[in-house]
Amino acid sequence: MNKLFRLILIFLSALIVITFNFNGSASQLDFDDGIDRFITSQMKTHNIPGLALAITHNNQVLHVKGYSAANNDHPVTAQTQFLIASVSKSFTAIAVMQLVEARQIDLDSPVQAYLPEFALTDPSFAQQPPGEIDAKVTIRHLLNQVSGLSDVGFPELQLSQATTIGERVTSLSQARPVELPGAQFHYFNPNYEVLARVVEVVSQQPFSDYLQTHIFTPLQMSRTLNATTRADASQGATNMAQGHLMAFGLPFAYPEMSGYLSGSGGIVSTAEDMANYLIFQTNSGQFQETKLFSESSVVLMHTPPKAISSSYGMGWFKGSENGETAIEHNGILSTFYTDVVLLPKEKYGIALLYNINASPLISMAFPQIKTGLIQLLKDGQPAVGGFSVTLWGIAIALLMFISVTLAIRSLLYLPQWRQSIHRTPLWRVWLGIGFTFLPAFFLLILPWIFALVSDRFFGHVLLFRSMLDLMLWLSVCAVLGVVNGIARLIFLARSNRLDAVS
């Protein structure tokens, strides 16, 4: 009887274990299926050619997978490599904080204590002796993006691109501060590029080697690397995603721009590797048995300075998603986009790596996908709806057709306009001619308008890449407007109205 009883207990225990595992597996399958349905639906709605996704909770990977459109010739997997752009800044901040904990860097020491060659163009507003401003910029200022430097005083994307970290530091001798150090937040890529050079000098290792030894290898990020330039990224990556641009809601493959990246945007990674990074970030700086630095350093990196109005910590923005504190950062290149968000309260982490970028996607699609995933994690159901980038493309195409039609109609009306010159007040004639040149004038000054609004300077090439359909529409309007305006000026010059005025 005792033997039979023991056999029954063993059978029931095994049944409970099997049932538990089955329910767990079924639950995981339901979760994965829900994620898959949501992502594929969003990709179809917004014509996204490919993305890779990693979701973690506590010290577990919940989901890691690559997704591709049906007609994609370069299928995306969890091992596909992406340029993660400005998400790289948090890795640079980790390197600095490791050296701070090793007492090799002092956050409040001047940058010049480590890089004597660090020098800026002294601004006239400061009314201080030459060399005073750059001598006051500290390591903490660079990390918090409050160095006083900005794209307005140093439009680095429009200048000759450095090929080494040392060249980037010396190129800042042309940079004009726009604020005193510590006074105000200005997002400025070279802040983190200077920090990369500080890491090199203090550690006596090339920056890429330092990251590999002290961050990538301990976190088992085997397919992750740091590139100094875009060309280095292509040479170093063995499975790089094909980047894309978008026009009128339609994606097309296009090479990424060349340029300098290291320190601010040079890391190449995969969804699989980023899952390990998310676990490290949401677990107080620990991954499995590896602890890269203290919990206090993680908290400091995630916390904006209190002395000024800023949401930027050290490589991270602090915000909110669905009413909950979120630590996040995106990464933007012309053909790649990355979204990383940490929910510290519940220890969730999400990394989205896209092989496409365009302003409509940044404004509409990418936020919808990020928010939908967060809602799916918290409520089990993502939000639906939102404006489709495909509809946006149709709307812009229609707007372009209407604009071109009206411009051609105006050109065809020129003979009648010429005859009406004598019956129209001269000021109205000049006003009408001036209006024809407005699109061209607006197109010319657009980079400075963006700089005024966003504190970032993007030249015409970058603007064309980021919003190709809008820029094409504006360019066509500008060309037709200039042709119209020149024709009217010629007609006016040949009339006797100008002779009468003179």
Give residue spans per PLM region:
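Hydrophobic secretory-pathway targeting helix
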Residues: 2-27
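Short, conserved catalytic-motif segment at the N-terminal edge
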Residues: 28-84, 120-131, 173-175
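Short glycine/serine- and small hydrophobic-enriched flexible loop segments
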Residues: 97-101, 196-201, 276-283
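Active-site helix/loop module of the DD-peptidase/beta-lactamase fold
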Residues: 50, 83-87, 99-150, 174, ...
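Stable alpha-helical elements in mature extracytoplasmic
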Residues: 31, 35, 47, 51, ...
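Catalytic loop of the DD-peptidase/beta-lactamase superfamily, centered on the K-T-G motif
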Residues: 26-51, 55-57, 255-502
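Catalytic-site signature segments of enzymes, centered on catalytic residues
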Residues: 129-130, 151-233, 239-245, 249-275
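Catalytic tyrosine of NAD(P)H-dependent dehydrogenase/reductases that use a Tyr as the general acid/base
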Residues: 82-85, 185-187
